[in-house]
């Protein structure tokens, strides 16, 4: 991917994100609108994405890494969207030897049977401490999930790095608030049943012993 001189390269953004504690911003090109404070940046979640992708890729096995104490290449930022609350980082490791997986697209430049390890990082909803959780992508497909269409995986592979450096919270999606509602319902039912058992006992025992006494 070629970058114009006025736009920071992917390597520059990734190195800044790996060396700064919060958000590494570099000046954007001349603004077209009146807002002169907009910057291009890579959020701190990108660092965790690279670490997560490297470690998980090492579990499944990879090729192309140097051994003997030589440090492996750093992960490359593929896409960062702080407004949407996620960052995509491609790990330098490759997952190889999985014959049942589809062949990688030609534009990725990988050999047959080798796939890029891409980590998607999403910050914990409501957390201001930037403690993200991540999931590994193998050529646009979540492990254990149906494959994402090639058009979507191409967007992830060729996406532009950099996004507006804005502090924003993430709204919990259905995959998060539905389990939370189920847990809250189970807890409320248990508490209600315990209170009923405690109140119906002949001799009101001291709390919380009444939780384990049934009425006679």
UniProtKB/Swiss-Prot annotation:
Mode of membrane association: Single-pass membrane protein
Tissue/organ expression: Expressed only in testis.
GO cellular component, one term: cytoplasm
TM segment ranges: 177-197
Main location, first listed in the record: cytoplasm
Location in or out of the cell: Cytoplasm; Membrane
Keyword list, A-Z: Cytoplasm, Membrane, Transmembrane, Transmembrane helix
Name of the protein described by the UniProt record: Putative transmembrane protein RNF32-DT
